Swiss-Prot record:
SUPFAM superfamilies: Ribonuclease H-like. It comes from the Bacteria. It catalyses: Endonucleolytic cleavage at a junction such as a reciprocal single-stranded crossover between two homologous DNA duplexes (Holliday junction). It comes from Acidobacterium capsulatum (strain ATCC 51196 / DSM 11244 / BCRC 80197 / JCM 7670 / NBRC 15755 / NCIMB 13165 / 161). Keywords: Cytoplasm, DNA damage, DNA recombination, DNA repair, DNA-binding, Endonuclease, Hydrolase, Magnesium, Metal-binding, Nuclease. GO terms for biological process: DNA recombination; DNA repair. PROSITE patterns: RUVC. The gene is ruvC. NCBIfam families: ruvC. HAMAP family: RuvC (MF_00034). One of its GO terms (molecular function) is magnesium ion binding. Mg(2+) 1 binds at residues 7, 147. This is Crossover junction endodeoxyribonuclease RuvC. The RuvA-RuvB-RuvC complex processes Holliday junction (HJ) DNA during genetic recombination and DNA repair. Endonuclease that resolves HJ intermediates. Cleaves cruciform DNA by making single-stranded nicks across the HJ at symmetrical positions within the homologous arms, yielding a 5'-phosphate and a 3'-hydroxyl group; requires a central core of homology in the junction. The consensus cleavage sequence is 5'-(A/T)TT(C/G)-3'. Cleavage occurs on the 3'-side of the TT dinucleotide at the point of strand exchange. Its cofactor is Mg(2+).
Length: 171
């Protein structure tokens, strides 16, 4: 199973690809393999429409290059700043469109679920998420940018939840 996680952002959209071969080791923890990660940074001088088009093109390029089985994204969350939330919603829409254009299924997870799955604590700070992502993926240092670490966390979250569902269905 190869999962493409996307962390939508108004300035940087992080992506991360994690693979989990079939089967789970005796420890009960999935055997995770890092494939790739990065951040999509459209130029600030571009208009909103141009920035969205840039993110869309880059996501389609990465999806084609890495051939995932599924795209996992963070669910919409509520923000005090309506303008920021609206911009984030635009980017999220572009990410969902890219996944749909590529013909891929989409899974969505709440921020608390992602953090809880990866760190064991739903209110974990960004640094804690980065640390645990690095540890789970056997990386020498936490991934940068932080948006890429969040995207990897989203992918890891899906793998854990998919394996839990498979285990329950096989009972």
């Amino acid at each position: 199973m190869r999962i493409f996680g996307i962390d939508c952002g108004s300035e940087i959209t992080g992506y991360g690809i994690v693979e989990c071969p079939d089967g789970t080791p005796r420890s009960g923890q999935p055997d995770l393999r890092l494939i790739a990660f990065g951040g999509i940074r459209p130029a600030k001088k571009l208009t909103l429409a141009e920035r969205l088009a840039f993110v869309h093109r880059e996501l389609l390029t990465q999806l084609a290059a890495h051939q995932p089985d599924l795209v996992a994204v963070e669910e919409v969350f509520y923000s005090v700043n309506a303008k920021s939330a609206l911009k984030l919603g635009h980017v999220r829409g572009v990410a969902l469109l890219a996944a749909a254009t590529a013909g891929l299924p989409i899974a969505e997870y709440a921020p608390l679920t992602i953090k809880s799955t990866v760190t064991g604590y739903g209110l974990a700070q960004k640094e804690q998420v980065q640390f645990m992502v690095a540890r789970l993926l056997h990386m020498p240092e936490p991934p940068e940018p932080a948006d890429a670490a969040d995207a990897l966390a989203i992918a890891i979250c899906h793998i854990h939840h998919a394996q839990t569902i498979q285990a329950q269905q096989s009972r």
